[in-house]
Structure formats: structure tokens, C-alpha cells
Amino acid sequence: MLKVGSSLLAADGGGLSPRFALGLAQFVSANLAAGRELVIVSSGAVAAGRAILPKAMDVGAPIAARQALAALGQAQLIALWQRFFERPVAQVLLTHDDLRNRRRYLNARATLGELLRLGALPVINENDTVSVDELKLGDNDNLAAIVAALVDADALFIATDIDGLYSADPRSNPLARPLDDVPELTPEVLAMAGGSGSNVGTGGMRTKLEAAAKAGAAGIETYLFNGRSGEVVRALALDRLRGTRIHAARTRIAARKYWLRHAPVEAGAILIDDGAAAALTGKGASLLPGGVAGAQGDFRRGDMVEIRRRDTTGDGQCLARGVSQYSALDIRRIAGRHSREIENVLGYSYGENVVHRDDLVVL
């Protein structure tokens, strides 16, 4: 899995630069020639769109203008990658809902698997044209980590515009030293990451470490490297790492539990009492309506939600995530009741559990 940010593809004068993409394409070609399968997660559609309509962000609403630029630039982005390869390049656009909904998540996995079987090179991007801003995945680092787990990748390579992870921000601290090997993403390591990186993209070093943590939970190592350095990219093509290696977690969680833990969450939560909290975290129990104190948001049956312990603020600690068997409206009506009362209260029942333990992961 290779993730390429827009800052590595954007030309100084606007649009996309084939010169910067060439080295990364050579890295891809070397891996393909070695018989490896590879998936690319590539940003750059909005940057490409700005070259077509440079004043779009000045005259339109920020969200609508960005979505329009993404629509204009996505074709340019795919064309950029296609020019480097003889094999077909497949465009795959994903949204928050595609990863949150279990059926669509599995369908995306099947599609990507078939593309790889057919010898195509999938190039994935978030579908900015239709993504609702408050439900956006946020950055392609996060998307790359989830897709890496989706396709059961062996490694996640994240191309950056610096040489990897440093002990401090090298742009502002001359004493910053590069870290070649990170056995574990401790709080101290996470604190080394600064804020945003280039002003072209949306992801800084912090998001890259968060992506590495998500990939690591699926047993996938992450490599951060300087995608602008031809020397570094050529070394990588020869399997000689020049950058930062971040080890996978010692214990790999099961595929379904990974999805429950890391898939995007609907804007909603189920509030539970102390007894239910103890049952979930200590006994691995399902969540029954008797332990439910209420619901936040307007989620539907089958949505992924957070499960929070109720406190005096009404918005307590998030203890778990899971797929709700009932809508927020239904949960408010059956909260605190016995499971046998569900059908009498609602007029129907989807079972005794609000969230079944097989559809739940404790954080």
C-alpha cells in the first residue's frame, strides 16, 4: 500500500507535476516487477482542479467550491498515474459511508481484490465531490490505513515531504534528529509529531502516526519516507529503507473487531449506566436496554455508534463502539426497560440486545 499526499504531486505554479510523480511511479513499478501487488491512495484532485479554475475558491462557498474542484481534478489525477504504467489504472472513490456500512465495506474489499486479480493498479481517493463535510474521513492518511487493513496489506508506505519522523519539527528546531526505527507508538513518540505539514494537503505528521497506529492494529508495518527525494525513492525500490519504520502492534486484532474499532462512526452515541459499563468492560456482555440511559444524535438501526458512560455532563467517557440494533428514536423509548418489554413499547422487536457483543468492541 502506497499513500501519496497532494503536496508531493502539486506543481509550484498549480496543477499536478509529472516530475514529482515519476520517482514514486518508479517505486511502484519496481514492486510490481518483483511480483508484488500494490494499491495507491492518492490525494491531488483538488490541487489539479485549482489549475483548471484557479478562482473557484474565491467566488464559491468553500465546501461547494472544493467539491467542484475535486470533480474537475479527479480525472487529471487518474490520468497522471495512468501515463506511467502499461497496466490499467482503476479509479476507486470511497466515502465515510462506504467504510462505516459493513456490507459496503466488504463489497469494497471484494472489488479491490478482483482488480488486483485482474492485474489492474487501483488508485483510491476520498470522494470529495459528494462527501458531507462533517462526515469526511479527514485525510488520506486515515483512509490509507483503513484500506491497508481492508486488503490485508503487508506494509503501508506513506510518502511525505520530509525524511520521516523526527524527535521535533525539523523546520523549526535545528536540533531535531531523525528516528529510523519506532518499535512502539508511545505517547512520547506521538508528542514528537507537530501540527499540519504542507499547506497543500490536510494531513500533518500527527495524522500519519495515527494512521500508523491504525495499520499497526491490523498487523501492518508503516514506513514514512521522503517522496520528493529521488535518492530515497530509488533506495526503497531496491528494498533499502531510508526513512522511519514503525512496527506493527504485537497483537493483531481480528478483522471484524478491527472494523468495529476503526471504521468511521456515525454522529451519535448510546449512553449507558455504571452497571452496563461494568458488564461491557468486565464481562464481555451484550448491551441490553435495561442498562441504557439514553441516546445522542439521530442514528439509524445498523449504524456504527459510540457507547458512552453517562455522567453529570450527559456526554461521558467513550467505552466502546458497536453496531446499534435500534435507531436513536427507538432507544430513547426503550431505555431502562427490560428486553421483554421492547415489542410492547415499539410494536416490533429486532431482538433483546441494543448492541450484541459480536457487534461491539471495548476501547
From Swiss-Prot:
Domain PUA span(s) in chain numbering: 267-349
Enzyme Commission code: 2.7.2.11
Lipid metabolism recorded as keyword: no
Transmembrane segments: none
Principal location: cytoplasm
Reaction catalysed by this enzyme: L-glutamate + ATP = L-glutamyl 5-phosphate + ADP
Disulfide links within the chain: none
Binding, substrate: S43, D128, N140
Annotated InterPro entries: AceGlu_kinase-like_sf, Asp/Glu/Uridylate_kinase, G5K_ProB, Glu/AcGlu_kinase, Glu_5kinase, Glu_5kinase/COase_Synthase, Glutamate_5-kinase_CS, PUA
Domain of life where this protein originates: Bacteria
Recorded family membership: Belongs to the glutamate 5-kinase family.
Functional note: Catalyzes the transfer of a phosphate group to glutamate to form L-glutamate 5-phosphate.
Name of the protein: Glutamate 5-kinase
